[in-house]
Amino acid sequence: MGHLSAPLHRVRVPWQGLLLTASLLTFWNPPTTAQLTTESMPFNVAEGKEVLLLVHNLPQQLFGYSWYKGERVDGNRQIVGYAIGTQQATPGPANSGRETIYPNASLLIQNVTQNDTGFYTLQVIKSDLVNEEATGQFHVYPELPKPSISSNNSNPVEDKDAVAFTCEPETQDTTYLWWINNQSLPVSPRLQLSNGNRTLTLLSVTRNDTGPYECEIQNPVSANRSDPVTLNVTYGPDTPTISPSDTYYRPGANLSLSCYAASNPPAQYSWLINGTFQQSTQELFIPNITVNNSGSYTCHANNSVTGCNRTTVKTIIVTELSPVVAKPQIKASKTTVTGDKDSVNLTCSTNDTGISIRWFFKNQSLPSSERMKLSQGNTTLSINPVKREDAGTYWCEVFNPISKNQSDPIMLNVNYNALPQENGLSPGAIAGIVIGVVALVALIAVALACFLHFGKTGRASDQRDLTEHKPSVSNHTQDHSNDPPNKMNEVTYSTLNFEAQQPTQPTSASPSLTATEIIYSEVKKQ
């Protein structure tokens, strides 16, 4: 049996492995009852790198140990054996020269390949000739190269073709991801993934699908992304537009028209005037135009790749009408009016001819109203009668097919002088109250005059009655001594009657005076 000790020390081991080995040899002191195990460091290994099969809980008092490729001890698949007494390693049939065994039974495999993927079994031979085994494993993945994207159609036609992208190369145990415009793949019914996500298909390509597109490949040990790829989507032409948008021109002006239609590749243009071909250019220029240049101008756009054609027709009118309309003026019959009483006339004045007039109220077109009338030609606006809601700003606009201009605004103020009925008594109610008060005062005055008159007459009559009874009283007085003692005293009664008309007064809680009051006056003889 040959000795492996010399090759063992000639193997180049990275400094990380040497550091790990030193630590294992220095501090390894497993408990005697622990189970023998192995650990792959790392478990997932990149192809061309190295892996260490680290042993834990190695028993004491051993004769030696051996490593085997697979999940069981098989002499034909022995990698290496190690005798502790001689500290010599002996290669087995499965040894590739890339393996290194350490005194602590750990096994280092360098420059691994995908064929190294799998299980490895350690067998330890104890001094009591009882063997103990432990199995570990690791997986070797390729170091992924930079992928690339292939396409079945790099110049698809919009709304017609489909495009299939494929991420190359095909690699086992690899994940494929796609990116569009530096974003992960969106959810869309037009995007389909197949072949383990290696193939991305775009259905019914549009001009917005130009990209860029990228594919990324990943495995547990590496990742890489392709260079971006863009699509050259052919489309168009869309309906062309002619600029500028002006329709009216003055004689003597220069006519310069430009045509544009979105298209890929760029469209080819041609011009027709009144149906007659003029030239094959994108721009059309006619100097010093006259009224004879009025007519229909047609722009024709063509895409030779898509085979599509589009046209646009624009009408040009050359006229003597003023290209600039002067600013009009508004004149008002009055600017402050009384609501529901007054009317007002607003007149829009301009020196231009061949123009039209329209009116605006509070930044809006003049509303339709039976009270608002426009004269022929819209020169005068009449409002009759003016209402509260008619207050605000008015202005007029004069325009022709070439230009327009607006007047300064004018403010219409609407006043209301009548007192609102809901805030007090109506004028009729106030007049009724005044008349009632005057009538009441007159009745009281008449009643008082009657009372004073009848009162004076009553006092005079009473005075006469008293005078007539005085002699009797006197006689009774004089004859007092002659009266018999038992004779009753004579009593004379005077009656005063006062009659007065009761005046009309408002209803009151106090009782009314009686029509007649009787006063009795008693005169006794002494």
From Swiss-Prot:
The protein's gene is named CEACAM1
Q: Changing Y493F: reported impact?
A: Impairs phosphorylation
Side Extracellular, residues: 35-428
Bias (Polar residues) ranges: 489-513
What tissues has this protein been observed in? Expressed in columnar epithelial cells of the colon (at protein level). The predominant forms expressed by T cells are those containing a long cytoplasmic domain. Expressed in granulocytes and lymphocytes. Leukocytes only express isoforms 6 and isoform 1.
One GO term under biological process is: insulin receptor internalization
Show the segment(s) annotated as Interaction with calmodulin. Answer: 450-462
* Pfam families per UniProt: ig (PF00047), Ig_2 (PF13895), Ig_3 (PF13927), V-set (PF07686)
TM helices/strands, residue ranges? 429-452
Span of the signal peptide = 1-34
Please give the family membership noted in the entry.
Belongs to the immunoglobulin superfamily. CEA family.
Q: Which organism is it from?
A: Homo sapiens (Human)
- Disulfide-bonded cysteine pairs: these are C167-C215, C259-C299, C348-C396
Q: How does it sit in the membrane?
A: Single-pass type I membrane protein
Recorded GO terms, molecular function?
Answer: actin binding; bile acid transmembrane transporter activity; calmodulin binding; filamin binding; identical protein binding; kinase binding; protein dimerization activity; protein homodimerization activity
Instruction: Tell me what induces its expression.
Output: Induced in primary T cells by activation with IL-2.
* Subunit-structure text: Monomer. Oligomer. Heterodimer. Homodimer. Cis-dimer/oligomer (via Ig-like C2-type and/or via cytoplasmic domains); induced by trans-homophilic cell adhesion through an allosteric mechanism transmitted by the Ig-like V-type domain, and is regulated by intracellular calcium and calmodulin. Interacts (via cytoplasmic domain) with calmodulin in a calcium dependent manner; reduces homophilic cell adhesion through dissociation of dimer.
Give me the ranges of the annotated region Disordered. Answer: 461-513
> Which region ranges are annotated with the description Required for interaction with PTPN11 and PTPN6 and for control of phosphorylation level?
489-526
- Name this polypeptide is given: Cell adhesion molecule CEACAM1
Q: Which SUPFAM superfamilies match?
A: Immunoglobulin
Instruction: Region Essential for interaction with PTPN11 and PTPN6: list its residue ranges.
Output: 520-523
Tell me where in this chain the Ig-like V-type domain is found.
35-142
Keywords on this record? Cell junction, Cell membrane, Cell projection, Cytoplasmic vesicle, Disulfide bond, Glycoprotein, Immunoglobulin domain, Membrane, Phosphoprotein, Pyrrolidone carboxylic acid, Repeat, Secreted, Signal, Transmembrane, Transmembrane helix
Q: Tell me the residue ranges located in the Cytoplasmic compartment per UniProt.
A: 453-526
